């Protein structure tokens, strides 16, 4: 988030400063942080909402988050442009879900949907070439050049990939807990803190939304 903040506040030559009032989103599967920025690059407001990921949510669910969590917190009624950088936003058909959901609630002159990795790369590298990595609920990396991701190994999500991520570490921890393979003191502490049964864990993992 700090990287994105530095990028969009300090890079006065970036395209977004052609617009009067910008809303910039950095979204993972767990949380979305929205930055409201004026034409001079001043940060006016920072808002947190639930995460938005088009692999797990429909247009209507995206719209619900925007309507009930973002819009009530916005200090102004008019946004000129939205730049959304999000997990799962690497495919046009998935980007369309986020875009449609946002536009159901907010009326803007323009909107761009890109991957969270591109947002991180632009924040880290600016106009220079370089390697950018992100590590959160998921994990990803790329070689960045000329404002775009030039090379990337697909992260494949928490089931097939996302090595080293919070989801991967959490999956390992939960698996060891259920198999009673944790050190006894850790096993006891986990059980006492979360008080969750094997049936509940399996239900949340295989039946409920956002298993990661």
Regions found by a protein language model. Give the residues of each.
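Short glycine-aspartate micro-motif
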Residues: 22-26, 81-83, 130-134
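Short glycine-rich, Thr/Ser-proximal phosphate-binding strand/loop in the N-terminal lobe
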Residues: 22-64, 149-151, 155
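Short beta-strand scaffold segments in enzyme catalytic cores
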Residues: 32-36, 122, 133, 139-144
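N-terminal phosphate-binding loop and adjacent alpha-helix
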Residues: 45-78, 89-97
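Short beta-strand-loop/turn "lid" adjacent to the catalytic site in phosphate-handling enzymes
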Residues: 71-112, 124-125, 206-208
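Conserved phosphate-binding catalytic cores of ATP/NTP-utilizing and phosphoryl-transfer enzymes
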Residues: 109-133
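Glycine-rich phosphate-binding loop plus the immediately following alpha-helix
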Residues: 149-196
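An accessory alpha-helical subdomain
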Residues: 191-212
């Amino acid at each position: 988030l700090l990287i994105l903040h530095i990028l969009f506040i300090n890079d006065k030559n970036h395209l977004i400063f052609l617009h009067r009032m910008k809303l910039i989103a950095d979204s993972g599967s767990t949380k979305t942080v929205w930055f409201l920025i004026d034409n001079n690059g001043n940060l006016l407001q920072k808002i947190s909402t639930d995460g938005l990921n088009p692999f797990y949510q429909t247009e209507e669910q995206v719209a619900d988050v925007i309507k009930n969590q973002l819009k009530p917190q916005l200090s102004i009624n008019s946004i000129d442009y939205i730049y959304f950088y999000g997990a799962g936003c690497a495919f046009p058909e998935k980007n369309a879900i986020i875009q449609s959901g946002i536009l159901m609630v907010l009326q803007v002159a323009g909107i761009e949907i890109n991957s969270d990795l591109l947002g991180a790369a632009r924040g880290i590298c600016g106009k220079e070439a370089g390697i950018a990595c992100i590590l959160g609920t998921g994990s990803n990396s790329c070689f960045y050049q000329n404002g775009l991701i030039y090379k990337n190994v697909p992260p494949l999500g928490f089931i097939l990939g996302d090595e080293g991520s919070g989801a991967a570490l959490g999956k390992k921890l939960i698996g060891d807990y259920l198999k009673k393979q944790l050190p006894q003191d850790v096993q006891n502490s986990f059980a006492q803190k979360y008080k969750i049964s094997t049936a509940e864990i399996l239900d949340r993992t295989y039946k409920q939304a956002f298993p990661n």
